[in-house]
Amino acid sequence: MKGKIRIRRAFAEFFVYGGLPKGVNAVNRLEAVNDAFREIYLAGVIVRHTVSNTSALRMLHKQVAESIGQPLSFTRLTKMVKEAGMPIAKNTCISYLQYACESSLVLPISNIVGKLQERDSSQKYYFVDNGFIRLLKSDPKADQLENLVALHLLRRHGFNDRVFFYRPKQLPSEEGRFPSTKY
């Protein structure tokens, strides 16, 4: 019985704070996750790509965390960052998101039924560690669960097109049927 309790407690901590080695044995796990986020990813992205608008980069990561589980287009993300008071161009937003993907901060998943252009420009993004979501969002439990499932699927099935989401062009009506099309 003690073994099950320890496993549940360890999973609960992993679920909330993630599994980065730096935070596992830390006294203040949230601070350790914050340090890892700041040092490894933000500093790596900022230094490697000479990002000058660091506040917009941080806001972009926050908006991605707020949108976990939702398809996120570059236009929508740019608008969300601008509405938060950070001036940013769409091309800059695209670059910042690509930097986050290159640094393995976030992982993209494409819509299987979208056009090729839509697959690249309207994806779902998941953070590589659940602790990062906890840093960027006030009530993250549902998003952390979806993030954890997405990470498991990506690890199990690979980072290619075998993991995707399905979002049809037309959503079903309240009765659960797709609208009929007349030819």
Predicted feature locations:
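Amphipathic alpha-helical segments of the small helical/lid subdomains adjacent to P-loop NTPase cores
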Residues: 1-19
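Accessory nucleic acid-recognition modules appended to NTPase machines
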Residues: 24-182
